[in-house]
Amino acid sequence: MNPLNLDQVREYVNENIVDFHQRRIRSLEELELRKLLTKNPYLFKAKNIATAGELISGLLDAFLSSSEEKLFGDFLEHLAVFIASKTCDGHKSTAPGIDLEFFNKGIHYVVSVKSGTSWGNSSQQKKLEEDLRNAVVRVRQSKRGANIQPVLGICYGKTRTSYVRGYLKVVGQNFWCLISDNKDLYTDIIEPIGHRAKEHNEAFLFEKSRVTNRFTKLFIDGFCEDTGAIDWVKLVEFNSSNYDLDRFLS
């Protein structure tokens, strides 16, 4: 492999982390209260939420947690492709479900990159197996006799390297080392990822406060009683009312 220039990694991260923060803000700007209210209302009732502001803050945090995991996962996957492009002429794969292909020490790697270990349900995992198998077949058709290794690469976590249903599962430090030959890369990328984080987060929190206030007002107008109490029945009806079972059981 070619030695990795960490300055290039820092430059890439500094330029592209901005997109992650911009997408965070955009996800807030495009959010509608009706989408937020699809979250589990029973959970918040069980937690004894009593004020509209507290409920909206909790719903918003739950939405952002899943949204940001996806957004940052995209960033990490792109970072992995960039690093492989520098160390071993890796490239973004055109095969469905495959993110990266690279060649090292006589082995052609086809890699599906995920951000964390809890990345998919059983049907999604079966689809991954199928995508990796198909990618191996495609490479073998163009490169007869090639040594091809399908890989599930996961950007963070401590799970040990293992063979799983025909592919190699590589996690955390081992994954970053696989694409760089640098055992310390997983910690080297921490500092540039935090580039201007405080500044970006302040802009995000400002937008979040605006959305929280706006949604709280809308929620009070639509889902609170004249006394000011949350109308939980009305909220659950909005969230889950869909009765049509009689059409199927009569």
What is each stretch, according to the model?
Residues 13, 17-24, 80-88, 132-143:
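Hydrophobic, Leu/Ile/Phe/Ala-enriched alpha-helical segments that form helix-helix packing faces
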Residues 84, 99-102, 106-119:
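Conserved catalytic cores of phosphodiester-cleaving nucleases, focusing on short active-site segments
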Residues 153-250:
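Domain-level recognition of nuclease-like catalytic cores that cleave nucleotide substrates
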Residues 1-75:
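Interdomain/boundary linker segments immediately adjacent to catalytic/signaling cores
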Residues 93-101, 151:
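Short, surface-exposed recognition loops or helix-turn segments adjacent to catalytic cores
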Residues 63-93:
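A broadly used, surface-exposed interaction patch
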Residues 115-180:
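Catalytic cores of nucleic-acid endonucleases
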